[in-house]
Design a protein with these regions (language model features):
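Secondary-structure boundary/capping motif
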Residues: 98, 165, 271, 350-351
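C-terminal substrate-binding/catalytic lobe of Rossmann-fold NAD(P)-dependent oxidoreductases
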Residues: 8, 17, 31-82, 181-186, ...
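Structured loop/turn residues at secondary-structure junctions
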Residues: 14, 94, 161, 247, ...
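N-terminal Rossmann-like NAD(P) cofactor-binding subdomain of oxidoreductases
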Residues: 2-203, 207-210, 241, 330, ...
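NAD(P)-dependent Rossmann-like dehydrogenase/reductase catalytic/cofactor-binding core
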Residues: 319-369
């Protein structure tokens, strides 16, 4: 598709942690220019640097290009914002039904929405996409536009940030050798709760064995990602059963998962080497299209023989701008076919970076024109 040289974008929820991450990612983007920053009514009308103030949690400074930008009202300026931009990224902290309604208002104002929120993840005609795994789900968008009565407006969402740490590893193998069931335990960073050690001192030297709603999301959402378009909806898969337990751990960024899994046909399961080769060689559509935020190698592999103490969060989370997945310790299991570990950067691959990559996929395929 012949694209425009530049697309104007808005960030809805610009003062929150994911919103801040969007700003740093889009600041020097080759295709996109930040045109609008929007947040709650209490931030509206202020310069961005004053609205965000001490809440700025990124390592880098607030980019000069947005520091003095006047923040718009995310809920009351929908039509104004829609006129100014080609599409918006949305990461707001509101009640679920309010988010659902807000995102539909933007879509109906003919402004595509790439959402980091969970509100529309189970709307049957809203694609929930990990760009390397199920890019074909964008083909549901014409059906969604028909329902919304729009020409170009639509909503596309990314999955929960925990999924990136375990689903890619299984999904790539599942394409060739169907996996039947898996047991997953996730060890999730505090930035997933929008916090830092400064704002959540209780997490220092602590571990919380519970994250509200997270286990259900982690078990249910993979079914939609692995589902198929049938008629005017995405029908979730019922093939791969995942059981999950989630922990909040004292780590700033990066979600890790311990995974036990078994194949439908265990007698003819692939070898450890074969699985590791599938991971290392896998190229998805983002790699084929060479999208700006696509990691050169989607899955980085550490073998049990050569690097049993890898992947470690501190080093692995930064690979390819935080967009790569790292897998290691693949070995035979006594109760399952195999066991392994996998990790990803939860606010880059798992949140803002994954949403930017999804926007790039949609742009390259002509959905933003």
């Amino acid at each position: 598709v012949k694209m425009k040289d530049n697309y104007k974008v808005g960030i809805i929820g610009a003062t929150g942690m994911v919103g801040q991450r969007f700003i740093t990612l889009l600041n020097d983007h080759p295709w996109y220019t930040i045109e609008v920053l929007a947040a709650s009514p209490r931030s509206a009308g202020k310069a961005y640097k004053d609205a965000v103030g001490a809440k700025w949690a990124m390592d880098e400074e607030i980019p000069a290009s947005v520091a003095d930008m006047v923040v718009m009202d995310a809920t009351n300026d929908v039509e104004k914002i829609a006129e100014k931009v080609d599409f918006v990224f949305c990461a707001v902290d509101m009640k679920k039904d309010e988010i659902k309604a807000l995102e539909e208002r933007y879509a109906k104002a003919e402004c595509p929405v790439v959402s980091n929120n969970s509100a529309h993840r189970h709307t049957p005609d809203v694609p929930m996409i990990i760009p390397e795994i199920n890019p074909q789900h964008i083909e549901i968008i014409p059906a969604q536009r028909e329902r919304l009565g729009t020409k170009r407006g639509f909503i596309a969402v990314k999955s929960n940030c925990s999924l990136q740490s375990y689903l890619p590893a299984m999904a790539v193998v599942n394409m060739k050798y169907p996996i039947d069931h898996a047991l997953v335990t996730t060890y999730q960073a505090i930035s997933g709760a929008g916090k830092t050690f400064k704002t959540w001192p209780e997490m220092v030297d602590n571990l919380i064995p519970y994250i509200g709603g997270e286990e259900m999301k982690s078990e249910v959402e993979p079914n939609k990602v692995l589902g198929k378009i049938e008629g005017k909806e995405i029908v979730p898969s019922t093939e791969l059963q995942i059981e999950c337990q989630t922990y909040r751990v004292p780590v700033s960024n990066g979600h890790t998962a311990a995974i036990f899994f078994s194949f439908k046909d265990s007698a003819n399961k692939p070898s450890v080497e074969e699985i590791e080769k599938m991971w290392a060689e896998y190229k998805g559509v983002p790699q084929e299209l060479n999208l700006p935020h696509a990691p050169k190698q989607f899955i980085h592999v550490y073998t049990e023989k050569d690097a049993p103490d890898q992947p470690q969060i501190k080093t692995a989370r930064e690979i390819d701008g935080g967009m790569a997945i790292s897998c290691g310790r693949l070995r035979e299991s006594t109760q399952y076919d195999y066991k392994m570990v996998s990790m990803s950067h939860n606010t880059l691959r798992g949140a803002a970076g994954g949403a930017v990559l999804l926007a790039e996929l949609l742009t390259a395929k002509g959905y933003m024109d």
